């Protein structure tokens, strides 16, 4: 049994990069044909598939100026939610699981197994883009998805974009500010990947197990960086929650004003 790290991180969501519509400096063009494209759908079309019926239900009885005409644009222009999210998974690094080596080929096999049940495990994360890249130093997986919730009982559409609620629907309730729904979900997915890796003779070498080998300065530096990342992630969640509440309050006030106008 060999030991390897397992990485799961939030990506920037560059669809053009994932689809290789351009080549970044770290991409080897002669290896692009090795990449595996599992899913490559048009984001706008998937939005129509997921939300058009909900938009129709929401607009019933609404004044024209209160109706939603394009949900994709509403999310794109708003600050409440992102159009989509991306996660990246990788086993090992360029030193021990490099592309073109037997170890790298094993990483590809494990990632391939892992991704095939991703959508089944995560029903409320609608995958529209999924790519396994082998034209960079280490094989890695990009998964682009739209998080959504159905049967929403509060203000707004009954089916809507919401990362927090999508993850709650999957059973990740969140805890303190360092134990958010996203953190819980990411850890769970890494555990799923680790279990598959174990079946192929790879044991998960979790970060922090070898900190005693770092000198004090490097250890503290690493811990500070980790803390900053956690705080940035928490800030993003709190901002999203605040904006969601603000939007609901604004919508309620607008409804009250409409009732007043109709009464007058």
Where does each model-flagged region fall?
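N-terminal nicking endonuclease/strand-transfer module with a His-rich metal-binding environment
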Residues: 1-264
């Amino acid at each position: 049994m060999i030991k390897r790290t397992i990485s799961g991180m939030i990506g920037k969501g560059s669809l053009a990069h994932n689809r290789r519509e351009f080549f970044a400096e770290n991409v080897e063009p002669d290896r692009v044909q090795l990449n595996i494209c599992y899913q490559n759908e048009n984001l706008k079309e998937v939005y129509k598939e997921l939300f058009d019926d909900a938009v129709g239900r929401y607009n019933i009885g609404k004044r024209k100026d209160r109706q939603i005409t394009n949900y994709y644009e509403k999310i794109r222009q708003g600050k409440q939610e992102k159009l989509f999210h991306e996660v990246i998974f990788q086993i090992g690094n360029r030193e021990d699981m490099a592309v073109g080596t037997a170890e790298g080929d094993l990483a590809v096999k494990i990632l391939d197994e892992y991704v095939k049940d991703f959508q089944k495990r995560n029903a409320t994360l609608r995958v529209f883009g999924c790519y396994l890249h082998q034209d960079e130093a280490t094989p890695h997986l990009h998964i682009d998805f739209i998080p959504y919730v159905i049967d929403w009982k509060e203000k707004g559409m009954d089916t809507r974009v919401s990362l927090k609620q999508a993850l709650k629907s999957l059973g990740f309730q969140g805890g303190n500010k360092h134990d958010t729904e996203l953190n819980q979900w990411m850890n769970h997915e890494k555990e799923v990947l680790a279990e598959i890796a174990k079946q192929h003779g790879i044991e998960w070498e979790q970060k922090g197990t070898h900190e005693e080998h770092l000198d004090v300065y490097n250890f503290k530096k690493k811990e500070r960086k980790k803390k900053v990342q956690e705080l940035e992630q928490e800030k993003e969640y709190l901002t999203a929650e605040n904006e969601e509440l603000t939007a609901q309050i604004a919508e309620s006030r607008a409804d009250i004003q409409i009732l007043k106008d109709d009464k007058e």
